[in-house]
Amino acid sequence: MSEYVIETKGLTKEYNGKRSVSDLNLHIKKGRIYGLLGRNGAGKTTTMKMILNLINSSDGEVIVFGKSMKKHNKEILPRIGCLIESPGFYPNLTGTENLKIFAELRGIPKRNAIKESLELVGLKYNDKKLFSQYSMGMKQRLAIALAVMHDPEILILDEPINGLDPIGIAEVRTFIRKLCTEKGKTILISSHILSEIELIADDIGIIDNGVLLEEESLEELKNMNKKYIKLVAHNDSKAVKVLEACFNIKNYSVEKNGTIKIYDLDLVIPELVRELVNEGIAVEEIRMKEDTLEDYFKRITGGAGIA
């Protein structure tokens, strides 16, 4: 039996001869939160739709619970809850009344399932507030309550914090983590917001232009970040000449803002400062630093697009 609850093998999607997702190999472990991170248009939603069999892949395979999704979708899909696009709730009904309609359509025992799912996301069963009066955060909560109402083993959530204010984001993040730690759900969540994925995910896949660039646990990704000496000098070009001529330093980079990152950690900082001052170069800042996850993501995706 595979250790992965969801696995994709060479998953590919083409539209009019152009690939939106290319040869994707995801590995999602049971009882963990997997964050699919990428800029808008990177292929996150398309990937989730293929996993859920909502759209056909052009090539490749989706394996869920050790079985082919294409061959066994009728058996697999009832064990999955999802939020890909906002459900069509009735604006003039309460949250509970809306869920009752969906429960009846799906043949779910109403009261207990609805009450438990609402409580799980912090909404009240007897609340008389209409859906049209809900805040964005409450609407997202209700959508996730609908996704978990049938007690699925897997949750697939596409950008669940999109459009929320900071309080709403924190609330949604808290109960998603609760679903994993207390209920044992396996959760696949997508986002273009790095800081949120960093706060919630156990494992991260980085997708860009439909290609999976990296897949690691959050802990491993943090360990991959480089330590360096940050140098901000009045004249970066002259400072670089000192590094090369006086200290034989070759392993460095110069940022667009003039900041110099020195990756040779054997360099003695006081000696460097003394030499720079002797050359008439004012030192504004020098200290040991470590690349953040944002630095790493920008480096492998080639720049902007991830908040």
PLM regions: where:
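Generic alpha-helical secondary structure signal
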Residues: R19, R111-K115, A170, E219, ...
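ABC transporter nucleotide-binding domains
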Residues: E3-T8, K13-I189, L194-D208, L212-E214
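Generic structural signal for individual residues within well-ordered alpha-helical segments
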Residues: L77, L99-K100, K115-L118, A170, ...
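Alpha-helix boundary recognition
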Residues: F65, P78, E198, K222, ...
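Alpha-helix N-cap/helix-start and coil->helix boundary motif
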Residues: T12, T96, L120, L194, ...
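ABC transporter nucleotide-binding domain
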Residues: T174-Y263
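Short, charged/small-residue-rich alpha-helical element at the C-terminal edge
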Residues: K227-I300, A307
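Short, Lys/Arg-enriched, disordered terminal segments
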Residues: M1-Y4, G302-A307
